[in-house]
């Protein structure tokens, strides 16, 4: 298993819509053992994104975790993020590869998209596996079988996303994904740190064959 895959087991995407700040949520997840944090924010100014990004970068370093910025390669470069995550409507993966030196994750919702971008990507974010309300432009759910087809068609690590929680995570992990990406399973929980710890332990036990 590569170093990157080790970090991707539970991948938390921060969301401030649930009453806590990006920084508060990230630190709770990091304390629980999450080792990949993505900062996704579509509504703030570039200046505010930079300020929050710098704080998240410092936090993730404290916990030896990887830090990704969604879409904004400029912010990722400015805060020295480990990686950037881009969608199908963002900068093309091949162009991002020319200007960004770190990890690049690319969203894919079908085999065609996955195969098109895998040679430029360090990992693929695949989904939504289940119907989701957290991302307005997420598209139709691909289901477990859709996820499995994509995992089997590419050679880079796949991180599954889309309404994944501790009730359905094992079913998702059985497809061979490197990890699961979550938002509301942690951010919307009454106790985000506990929710994150339960997910981390669940994935650890699955990967250990327990």
UniProtKB/Swiss-Prot annotation:
<protein>
    <recommendedName>
        <fullName>Thiamine-phosphate synthase</fullName>
        <ecNumber>2.5.1.3</ecNumber>
    </recommendedName>
</protein>
<feature type="binding site">
    <location>
        <position position="135"/>
    </location>
    <ligand>
        <name>4-amino-2-methyl-5-(diphosphooxymethyl)pyrimidine</name>
    </ligand>
</feature>
<feature type="binding site">
    <location>
        <position position="107"/>
    </location>
    <ligand>
        <name>4-amino-2-methyl-5-(diphosphooxymethyl)pyrimidine</name>
    </ligand>
</feature>
<comment type="similarity">
    <text>Belongs to the thiamine-phosphate synthase family.</text>
</comment>
<dbReference type="GO" id="GO:0005737">
    <property type="term" value="C:cytoplasm"/>
</dbReference>
<feature type="binding site">
    <location>
        <begin position="183"/>
        <end position="184"/>
    </location>
    <ligand>
        <name>2-[(2R,5Z)-2-carboxy-4-methylthiazol-5(2H)-ylidene]ethyl phosphate</name>
    </ligand>
</feature>
<dbReference type="InterPro" id="IPR036206">
    <property type="entry name" value="ThiamineP_synth_sf"/>
</dbReference>
<dbReference type="Pfam" id="PF02581">
    <property type="entry name" value="TMP-TENI"/>
</dbReference>
<keyword id="KW-0460">Magnesium</keyword>
<feature type="binding site">
    <location>
        <position position="90"/>
    </location>
    <ligand>
        <name>Mg(2+)</name>
    </ligand>
</feature>
<keyword id="KW-0808">Transferase</keyword>
<dbReference type="GO" id="GO:0009229">
    <property type="term" value="P:thiamine diphosphate biosynthetic process"/>
</dbReference>
<dbReference type="InterPro" id="IPR034291">
    <property type="entry name" value="TMP_synthase"/>
</dbReference>
<comment type="pathway">
    <text>Cofactor biosynthesis; thiamine diphosphate biosynthesis; thiamine phosphate from 4-amino-2-methyl-5-diphosphomethylpyrimidine and 4-methyl-5-(2-phosphoethyl)-thiazole: step 1/1.</text>
</comment>
<dbReference type="InterPro" id="IPR013785">
    <property type="entry name" value="Aldolase_TIM"/>
</dbReference>
<dbReference type="GO" id="GO:0000287">
    <property type="term" value="F:magnesium ion binding"/>
</dbReference>
<feature type="binding site">
    <location>
        <begin position="132"/>
        <end position="134"/>
    </location>
    <ligand>
        <name>2-[(2R,5Z)-2-carboxy-4-methylthiazol-5(2H)-ylidene]ethyl phosphate</name>
    </ligand>
</feature>
<keyword id="KW-0784">Thiamine biosynthesis</keyword>
<dbReference type="InterPro" id="IPR022998">
    <property type="entry name" value="ThiamineP_synth_TenI"/>
</dbReference>
<keyword id="KW-0479">Metal-binding</keyword>
<feature type="binding site">
    <location>
        <begin position="38"/>
        <end position="42"/>
    </location>
    <ligand>
        <name>4-amino-2-methyl-5-(diphosphooxymethyl)pyrimidine</name>
    </ligand>
</feature>
<comment type="function">
    <text>Condenses 4-methyl-5-(beta-hydroxyethyl)thiazole monophosphate (THZ-P) and 2-methyl-4-amino-5-hydroxymethyl pyrimidine pyrophosphate (HMP-PP) to form thiamine monophosphate (TMP).</text>
</comment>
<dbReference type="GO" id="GO:0009228">
    <property type="term" value="P:thiamine biosynthetic process"/>
</dbReference>
<feature type="binding site">
    <location>
        <position position="71"/>
    </location>
    <ligand>
        <name>Mg(2+)</name>
    </ligand>
</feature>
<feature type="binding site">
    <location>
        <position position="70"/>
    </location>
    <ligand>
        <name>4-amino-2-methyl-5-(diphosphooxymethyl)pyrimidine</name>
    </ligand>
</feature>
<dbReference type="GO" id="GO:0004789">
    <property type="term" value="F:thiamine-phosphate diphosphorylase activity"/>
</dbReference>
């Amino acid at each position: 298993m590569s170093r990157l895959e080790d970090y991707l087991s539970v991948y938390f995407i921060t969301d401030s819509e649930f009453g806590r700040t990006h920084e508060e949520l990230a630190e709770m997840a990091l304390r629980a053992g999450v080792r990949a944090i993505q900062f996704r924010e579509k509504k703030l100014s570039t200046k505010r994104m930079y300020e929050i990004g710098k704080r998240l970068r410092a936090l993730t370093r404290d916990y030896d975790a990887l830090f990704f910025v969604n879409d904004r390669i400029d912010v990722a470069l400015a805060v020295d993020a480990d990686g950037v995550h881009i969608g199908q409507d963002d900068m093309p993966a091949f162009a991002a590869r020319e200007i960004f030196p770190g990890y690049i994750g690319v969203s894919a919702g079908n085999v065609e998209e996955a195969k098109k971008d895998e040679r430029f990507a360090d990992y693929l974010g695949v989904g939504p596996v289940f119907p989701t309300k957290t991302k307005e432009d997420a598209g139709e759910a691909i289901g477990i079988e859709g996820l499995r087809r994509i995992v089997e068609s590419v050679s880079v690590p796949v991180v599954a996303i889309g309404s994944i929680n501790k009730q359905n995570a094992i079913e998702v992990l059985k497809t061979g994904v490197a990890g699961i990406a979550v938002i509301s399973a942690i951010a919307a929980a009454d106790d985000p740190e506990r929710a994150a710890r339960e997910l981390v332990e669940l994935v650890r036990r699955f990967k250990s064959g327990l």
